């Protein structure tokens, strides 16, 4: 099973493009496993991975600049199909003897190309719209390369060396603005790399179970359960692999949603017969967070306290060597890599103290959110649990903006419960990717009855998305929003105003902190 899995790998090398994980995502949608790795990966490591094909991502650098990202040229001699996208195509050109220089004008946005209807463009229209995003251009092709697509402003929109199975495109096929981008990627993966497209959650489970058993042996694992979908799926997966060697520690840090703690104990402790220890740490977390308003500092404090608490619990349990987390692919990219600026430290990535005594197990850190949900269904977790709203590790701590107090937490907890109730009543749970309330650290004047009020404003955030990498605000019917607003103002103490966030990602993130 492991060998078959490795043979069906498409390796994506990261040169810093904002779209690099979308490449991986699109490939997986075709039933082929794909991983994103740093461009500095060695040839020996690549050989061990035995990929069926390699994609060089785009990136913000210019290939002729000193210190720009590069790759070992030996990658083109492995006998494996390689496709470069934008910067990846320019890098391939330069390393193989062609030339690249700055374009007179930066090309950004939609463009119409004219393509040869073979190779990457097999069974595709001769003319098609693509998404360009580049400020450099190829001037001369390396020996053995041909032009297979061009546009009025881009002489080399796509190139190939069929004898060596090397390809390049000066646009982004992974972006949905490229109308036949998925088809082009499919041609590369299926026709050129000869992948069969048999990657499923079923074989992912088999492989991960074997990995977990091999890594853990007869030792013990502690799983950090936050009450969210990610950690719950991880707990069930690891329990399936090693059974009673797993102990889940559910930290009730006082930052949970309404009814969260009891639900976790009932559904997973009783429902899946898992060993779960519930730790009441409300006072501990609140004392550490007292007076803290900076969001990064709050994340670090919450992350550190989690792990310090696990150290203490592990000492009681004895022989716990591993800490399991529900880290996702998107968590890693948003916490920054060698090629990406840190957007915000993630609770499962940037909040861990350096002296942590555990080895990490992160079995879903190569999956996107919708893949984790599919994994949960395959593991037998009921749909109503799998489709629960995503909940960050720091919990309501990052949905109360500024300093955290018990009063503010109660406002967010109650308003969020109302929002979820209304969305469920309207049958919109599956139509909206994520929805929650936040409490900005502002008050405003209002009138309730015959009296002037000066109370808090609650923000409602609801977005649509496919994989969490990008999102747009949900177009919820005004009558539904009015119902949400009316109930929150009338049922939640100290609130006199409700606002709706109509910002997409980017430029914003989904969470406010």
From Swiss-Prot:
Sorted alphabetically, the keyword list is: ATP-binding, Glutamine amidotransferase, GMP biosynthesis, Ligase, Nucleotide-binding, Purine biosynthesis
SUPFAM superfamilies given for it?
A: Adenine nucleotide alpha hydrolases-like, Class I glutamine amidotransferase-like, GMP synthetase C-terminal dimerisation domain
What does UniProt give as GO cellular component?
cytosol
Write out the pathway annotation from the protein's UniProt entry: Purine metabolism; GMP biosynthesis; GMP from XMP (L-Gln route): step 1/1
GTP-binding recorded as keyword: no
Instruction: Please write the reaction equations for the catalytic activity of this protein.
Output: XMP + L-glutamine + ATP + H2O = GMP + L-glutamate + AMP + diphosphate + 2 H(+)
- Provide the residue positions that the database annotates as binding ATP: 226-232
According to the entry, every stretch annotated as the GMPS ATP-PPase domain falls at: 199-388
The record's listing under Pfam families reads: GATase, GMP_synt_C, NAD_synthase
Q: Record's superkingdom?
A: Bacteria
* A GO term for molecular function: GMP synthase activity
- Every copy of the Glutamine amidotransferase type-1 domain together lies at 9-198
Q: Where is the active site?
A: 86, 172, 174
According to the UniProt record, what class of enzyme is this? ligase
Q: Is Ligase given among the entry's keywords?
A: yes
Q: What is its EC number?
A: 6.3.5.2
Q: Which CDD domains does the entry mention?
A: GATase1_GMP_Synthase, GMP_synthase_C
Q: What does this protein do?
A: Catalyzes the synthesis of GMP from XMP.
Record's subunit section: Homodimer.
Q: Which NCBIfam families match?
A: guaA_Cterm (TIGR00884), guaA_Nterm (TIGR00888), PRK00074.1 (NF000848)
Protein name in UniProt: GMP synthase [glutamine-hydrolyzing]
Q: Which organism is it from?
A: Macrococcus caseolyticus (strain JCSC5402)
């Amino acid at each position: 099973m492991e060998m078959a899995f490795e043979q069906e790998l498409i390796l994506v090398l990261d040169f810093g493009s904002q779209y690099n994980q979308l490449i991986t995502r699109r490939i997986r949608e075709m039933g082929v496993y794909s991983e994103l790795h740093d461009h500095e990966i060695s040839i020996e490591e690549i050989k061990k991975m035995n990929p069926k094909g390699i994609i060089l991502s785009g990136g913000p650098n210019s290939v002729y600049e000193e210190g720009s990202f590069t790759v070992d040229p030996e990658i083109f001699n492995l006998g494996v199909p390689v496709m470069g996208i934008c910067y990846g195509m320019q890098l391939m050109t330069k390393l193989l003897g062609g030339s690249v220089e700055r374009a007179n004008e930066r090309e950004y946005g939609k463009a119409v190309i004219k393509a040869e209807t073979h190779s990457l463009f097999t069974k595709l229209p001769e003319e098609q719209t693509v998404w360009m995003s580049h400020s450099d251009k190829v001037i001369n092709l390396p020996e053995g390369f041909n032009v297979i697509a061009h546009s009025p402003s881009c002489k080399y929109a796509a190139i190939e060396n069929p004898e060596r199975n090397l390809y390049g495109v000066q646009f982004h096929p992974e972006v949905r603005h490229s109308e036949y981008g998925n088809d082009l990627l499919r041609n590369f993966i299926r026709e050129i790399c000869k992948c069969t497209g048999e990657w499923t959650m079923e074989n992912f489970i088999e492989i991960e179970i074997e990995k977990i058993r091999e890594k853990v042996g007869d030792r013990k694992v502690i799983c950090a359960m936050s009450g969210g979908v990610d950690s719950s799926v991880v707990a069930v997966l690891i329990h399936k692999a090693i059974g009673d060697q797993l102990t889940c520690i559910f930290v009730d840090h006082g930052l949970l949603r309404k009814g969260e703690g009891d639900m976790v104990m009932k559904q997973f402790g009783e429902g899946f017969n898992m060993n779960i220890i519930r730790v009441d740490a409300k006072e501990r977390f609140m004392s550490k967070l007292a007076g803290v308003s900076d969001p990064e500092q709050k994340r670090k404090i919450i992350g550190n306290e989690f792990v310090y608490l696990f150290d203490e619990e592990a000492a009681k349990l004895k022989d716990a060597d591993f800490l399991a987390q529900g880290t996702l692919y998107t968590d890693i990219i948003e916490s920054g890599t060698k090629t990406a600026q840190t957007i915000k430290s993630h609770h499962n990535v940037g909040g861990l103290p350096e002296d942590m005594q555990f080895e990490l197990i992160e079995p879903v850190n190569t999956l996107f959110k919708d893949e984790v949900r599919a994994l949960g269904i395959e593991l037998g977790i009921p749909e109503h649990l799998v489709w629960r709203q995503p909940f960050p590790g720091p919990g309501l701590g990052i949905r109360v903006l500024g300093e955290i107090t018990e009063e503010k937490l109660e406002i967010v907890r109650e308003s969020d419960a109302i929002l979820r109730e209304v969305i469920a009543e309207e049958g919109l749970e599956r139509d909206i990717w994520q929805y929650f309330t936040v409490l900005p650290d502002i008050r405003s004047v209002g009138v309730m009855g015959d009296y002037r009020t000066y109370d808090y404003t609650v923000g409602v955030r609801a977005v649509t998305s496919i994989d969490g990498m990008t999102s747009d605000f949900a177009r919820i019917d005004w009558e539904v929003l009015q119902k949400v607003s009316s109930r929150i103002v009338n049922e939640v103490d100290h609130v006199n105003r409700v606002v709706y966030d109509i910002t997409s990602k980017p430029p914003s993130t989904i969470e406010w902190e």
